[in-house]
Regions:
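P-loop NTPase switch module centered on the Walker A-proximal segment
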Residues: 1-105, 145, 214-217
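Interdomain boundary/hinge elements
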Residues: 39-43, 127, 153-165, 199-210, ...
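Canonical P-loop GTPase G-domain recognition
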Residues: 124, 134-194
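Short glycine/threonine-rich beta-strand-turn micro-motifs
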Residues: 168, 352-367
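Conserved nucleotide-binding/hydrolysis modules and their immediate coupling elements
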Residues: 208-311, 319-323, 487, 496-546, ...
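Helix N-cap motif at beta-to-alpha junctions
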Residues: 230-232, 282-283, 362-368, 412-415, ...
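A short, contiguous, amphipathic alpha-helix enriched in charged residues
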Residues: 241, 318-341, 556, 560
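Long insertion/accessory domains within large nucleic-acid-processing enzymes
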Residues: 259, 264-267, 400, 446, ...
Length: 609
C-alpha cells in the first residue's frame, strides 16, 4: 500500500446559499489559477445558466488548485437532496469533505442529507463556518448544533473531533479565530492538507478506475469521469470495462484529461488517486470499472436511493401545438428523456400504454422541474401532469408512502397558521423552539403528498417571511386522504385573444393569471376560482359598439395586475384533471379535456361508477 502525499481529493458540502461556490472562487483566485489579466465571472463553479439564476448547484463539478507542491482536487456537490444521485457518486471520488455552514443559519436539512451520506462512507470532515462577518452570526452555537447533529448521525470518534475554520468567502479570508476580519485563505488550505487523508492504494498494481460521472461532447462522444483507485493509466492503453450487468468489454483509452483550475488539461498518464476524464470507451455508464485486462476486478458501486415522485411527460396536443417549439414529436421527447437517464442515475423513464406519453420518476419536485426547464430552453414543447408520489407495498401487503422531514423557520406570529395548515396535511411535529431573534424553529414529519402544493400556500400564510426545507425520510404506512387544492379554476370559454373588457368581467370571478392581448384556447386555465368548482369565463369578449351615445363618458376599465405563475407554481397549482403545457416561450395551464361538454360527460360517468 502506498500514499500520495502531494494530492488531496475533497468535496464541499453546503446548503443552498451558504456560500459554497463563492468560497471556491476565492480558493481559485488565491491559489493563482487565474492570470492577473483574466476576466473571471462571479460564482465560476455554477457554469449552467439555471444554476446561476437560481443560485443552486445541480450538477457536481470538479476543479483543482495547487497549494505549494500539493494538488487539491475540489468537487462541488449539489446542496439539495433532489439531486442526491449526484451526491452519492461524488463522495466515492474523495477522501474528505469540507462542511460549509452559515454562521447565522446553522446546519440545514439538505446539508444533513449529504453529511449523513459522507459520514456513512467514513469521510473525515473539516468544518468551515462561513459568513462569519454576517450580522447575527452565532459561531459557537452553530458548532454545538453541529456536534449534536454528528452524534445523531452516528459519527465515529475521529469524525467527532473535527477541526473548525471561520471564514468569509465574500471577503476572502479564513482563520482559526472567529473574531478575525482580515487575512487570506491560507488557514483553510493548511487544514485541508492536515486533516484530509492523502489517497492510499497500490500505485504499481493492476489498473482500476471507478467511473462516477459521465459527460458528453459532440466531438469526442461520451467522457467518463472517475478516480484511479489502483495503478496508473496512460493514453492508448487497452482496458477491460466491467459493466453493471456483470458483462465485460474491451476498449482503448482515447484521450486522458486531468483538472487544472476549471478546465480539463490533456495528459499522457495519471496515477493512484487522480481524478481523470477519459474518452474512447463506447457505451460507458456510471458505476462501471475500467480494469487491466489481465486482472478483471469490478469495484462495488454505491446504492442510489430510489425515486419518490413521478410525472407523465406527453406530446402537446393543445390547439397551439407546434407553434413555439422546435422539438415536438414523441420521438424527440423520448430520445431526450432516455438521454437524460444516461447521466442522471437517480431518474427513471418508463414507456406507457400510449406512444406519446412517458412516465418520468425522480427524487423530488425540484429535480423534475429542473429537467422540464432545461428541456424547455433546449427548444422542446410538451405537456406534463401533476406530480404523484410513488407508493410501495410493505412486507405484510400494506401500502407505504414516502415521508419527509420538514424544517420551518418563521416569525412567532405565524406559528399558529403554519401548524394548522400542516395538521390538515397529516404532519406530526417532532421538534419546536424559539431563538432570541423571535424566529421559531419547527420540525415536522409529513407525507410527501402533504407537501405538494403547500410551498405557495406557505409563502402566502407567512407573507413571504418563512423559510421551509424538506428532506426524504423513508417510507411509512399510508396516512389516509389529504385534502388537495379546494379552489377551482377559471377556464376559457372560446379560443381567441384576451381583451380588457373580457378580463374586467372575469376578474370579479377570481384571481387572473393572464393580462390583455394573450392568445388563449377553449379549456385553457386563466385564473383561480374562489369556489370549489371550475368557472367558465369569456376573457375574449369585446364591448359591442353601438351608434347610441351614452349620456356620460365611458369609464376607463381598471384591471387588477395578473399573477404570473412560474413553472414550479404551475406544477403546484394543477389538479389531477389538469396539465401544464410547456413551450420555449410560454407556460400554460389547461384542462386535460378541453371541451366543457366532454368534461361534464366525463364527470357524470365518474359519479355513476
Amino acid at each position: 500500500m502506498g500514499t500520495r502525499e502531494n494530492l488531496r481529493n475533497v468535496a464541499i458540502i453546503a446548503h443552498v446559499d451558504h456560500g459554497k461556490t463563492t468560497l471556491v472562487d476565492q480558493l481559485l483566485r488565491q491559489s493563482g489559477i487565474f492570470r492577473a489579466n483574466e476576466q473571471v465571472a462571479e460564482r465560476v463553479m455554477d457554469s449552467n445558466d439555471l444554476e446561476r439564476e437560481r443560485g443552486i448547484t445541480i450538477l457536481s463539478k470538479n476543479t483543482a488548485v495547487m497549494y505549494g507542491d500539493t494538488k487539491i482536487n475540489i468537487v462541488d456537490t449539489p446542496g439539495h437532496a433532489d439531486f442526491g444521485g449526484e451526491v452519492e457518486r461524488i463522495l466515492l471520488m474523495v477522501d474528505g469533505v469540507l462542511l460549509l455552514v452559515d454562521a447565522f443559519e446553522g446546519c440545514m436539512p439538505q446539508t444533513r442529507f449529504v453529511l449523513k451520506k459522507a459520514l456513512g462512507l467514513g469521510k473525515r470532515p473539516v468544518v468551515v463556518i462561513n459568513k462569519i462577518d454576517r450580522d447575527g452570526a452565532r459561531p459557537y452555537e452553530v458548532i454545538d448544533e453541529l456536534l449534536d447533529l454528528f452524534i445523531e448521525l452516528d459519527a465515529d470518534e475521529d469524525q467527532l473531533d473535527f477541526p473548525v475554520i471561520f471564514a468569509s468567502g465574500r471577503d476572502g479570508y479564513a482563520s482559526l479565530d472567529p473574531d478575525a476580519r482580515e487575512g487570506d485563505m491560507r488557514p483553510l488550505f493548511e487544514a485541508i492538507l492536515e486533516h484530509v487523508p492523502a489517497p492510499q492504494g497500490d500505485p504499481d498494481g493492476p489498473l482500476q478506475i471507478l467511473f462516477s460521472n459521465i459527460d458528453y461532447d459532440d466531438y469526442t462522444g461520451r467522457i467518463g469521469v472517475g478516480r484511479v483507485e489502483r495503478g496508473r493509466v496512460r493514453t492508448g492503453q487497452t482496458i477491460t470495462l466491467c459493466k453493471r450487468d456483470g458483462t465485460t468489454q474491451n476498449a482503448r483509452i482515447g484521450k486522458l484529461y486531468q483538472f487544472e483550475g476549471l478546465r480539463r488539461a490533456e495528459c499522457e498518464t495519471a496515477s493512484l488517486g487522480d481524478l481523470v476524464s477519459v474518452t474512447g470507451i463506447p457505451d460507458l455508464n456510471i458505476g462501471e470499472t475500467a480494469c487491466d485486462p489481465e486482472h478483471v476486478e469490478a469495484l462495488p458501486f454505491v446504492h442510489i436511493d430510489e425515486p419518490t415522485i413521478s410525472m407523465i411527460f406527453m406530446v402537446n396536443n393543445s390547439p397551439f401545438a407546434g407553434r413555439e417549439g422546435k422539438y415536438v414529436t414523441s420521438r424527440n421527447i423520448r430520445d431526450r428523456l432516455f438521454k437524460e437517464i444516461e447521466t442522471n442515475v437517480s431518474m427513471r423513464v418508463e414507456e406507457t400504454d400510449t406512444t406519446d406519453a412517458f412516465k418520468v420518476s425522480g427524487r423530488g419536485e425540484l429535480s423534475l422541474s429542473i429537467l422540464i426547464e432545461t428541456m424547455r430552453r433546449q427548444g422542446f414543447e410538451f405537456a406534463v401532469s401533476r406530480p404523484q408520489v410513488i407508493l410501495k407495498t410493505g412486507p405484510n401487503g400494506e401500502t407505504l408512502e414516502p415521508m419527509e422531514l420538514l424544517v420551518i423557520e418563521v416569525p412567532e406570529q405565524y406559528v399558529g397558521v403554519v401548524m394548522e395548515r400542516l395538521g390538515s396535511r397529516k404532519a406530526e411535529i417532532v421538534n419546536m423552539g424559539t431563538r432570541d431573534t423571535g424566529i421559531s424553529h419547527l420540525e415536522f414529519r409529513i407525507p410527501s403528498r402533504g407537501l405538494m402544493g403547500y410551498r405557495q400556500q406557505f409563502l402566502t400564510d407567512t407573507n413571504g417571511n418563512g423559510i421551509m426545507n424538506s428532506l426524504f425520510d423513508g417510507y411509512e404506512p399510508y396516512k389516509g386522504e389529504i385534502p388537495q387544492r379546494v379552489q377551482g379554476s377559471l377556464v376559457v370559454h372560446e379560443t381567441g385573444e384576451t381583451c380588457a373588457y373580457g378580463l374586467w368581467g372575469a376578474q370579479d370571478r377570481g384571481a387572473l393569471f393572464v393580462g390583455p392581448g394573450i392568445p388563449v384556447y377553449e379549456g385553457m386555465i386563466v385564473g383561480q376560482s374562489p369556489r370549489d368548482e371550475d368557472i367558465v369565463v369569456n376573457v375574449c369578449k369585446k364591448k359591442h359598439v353601438t351608434n347610441t351615445r351614452a349620456s356620460g363618458s365611458d369609464e376607463a376599465l381598471r384591471l387588477v395586475p395578473p399573477t404570473i405563475l412560474s413553472l414550479e407554481q404551475s406544477l403546484e397549482f394543477i389538479n389531477d384533471d389538469e396539465l401544464v403545457e410547456v413551450t420555449p416561450e410560454s407556460i400554460r395551464l389547461r384542462k386535460r379535456i378541453l371541451s366543457k361538454e366532454l368534461r361534464l360527460k366525463a364527470e357524470s360517468r365518474k359519479k355513476q361508477k
